[in-house]
Amino acid sequence: MLKVDRKIIVSMHPIIEADEFYWDRGVWDKDLFGLLQKAAAIILPQTVERELYYLCKKVCPQVFPNYDLRFLWEGKIGDTLAFWTYGVKHPHTLVFPRVETLLGDHSQMDHPVPELLQYPFVMKGAHAGEGRQVWLIENETELEEKLQTLLHLELEGIRGFVIQEYLPALDKDLRVVVVGDQVHSYWRKAPTFLHNVVQGGEIDSASDKELQEVGREKVWEFCRRSGINLAAFDLVFPAADDEPFFLEINYTFGRTGLGGSERFYTLLHDAVNQWLQANL
């Protein structure tokens, strides 16, 4: 690769100003490639495509945010692989790359039908989000119904799901948001299975401060080891357990619990500026 004089900062994030701006949803061409080669640092939006992220990583020494883990192991299956790898506490989880993994008795592959968790259990599509494709399965009829949904998704090229241990009697989960070196937290409360704000969950930033601090510390330790610097984590504290279970990692997430979009953009600006000062 030719040596280049890296003097500019390139932003593809519409609210982050830099020497050069390039819309990530615009045409990717040789001019873009040349621009990225000249960059000392690149700032990307949360919606960046995997291929563009890796192009930026290939040609530029400094890229924010760090999505290495996100694109190495994507979706809910990827979350499970990350939790296994970094040894964090999480509900017992089975990964199914396809529906036939659960249904098929493939003797020639030495693969019997796997033994499932006891009902009720949680089933999540590989690319579930905001409570969509997340189901509490209480019996075989419900399982068969959701497997049909997953089969239809496979026809669209969306494969894989997880079955996860159900942790009962939980009326809230802890959302921990990492923005650069900043860590914020709040509870999401709901009497139903799903606690997502978009699904009707209520935000509570004030209660159980000690548990919130524990959750923030656990997430920060995970991020320190994995390199994540922009994501939201969902944790729960089962009864009589002061150590949280990790449920999910969300690289795009709602901002209501942080105080809305304007507050999030302020946090993001601060995080980017601190990152630039530390890395350039």
Predicted features along the sequence, with ranges:
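Conserved N-proximal alpha/beta basic substrate-recognition cap immediately N-terminal to
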Residues: 2-103
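Active-site nucleotide/adenylate-binding loops and adjacent lid/helix of ATP-dependent enzymes
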Residues: 70-161, 213, 280
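C-terminal active-site "lid" helix and adjoining low-complexity regulatory extension at the edge
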Residues: 210, 224, 228, 237-280
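Phosphate-binding site of ATP-dependent enzymes
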Residues: 132-222
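Protein kinase-like catalytic core scaffold
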Residues: 121, 162, 184, 231, ...
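Short glycine/proline- and charge-enriched loop/turn segments
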Residues: 60-65, 195-204, 248-254
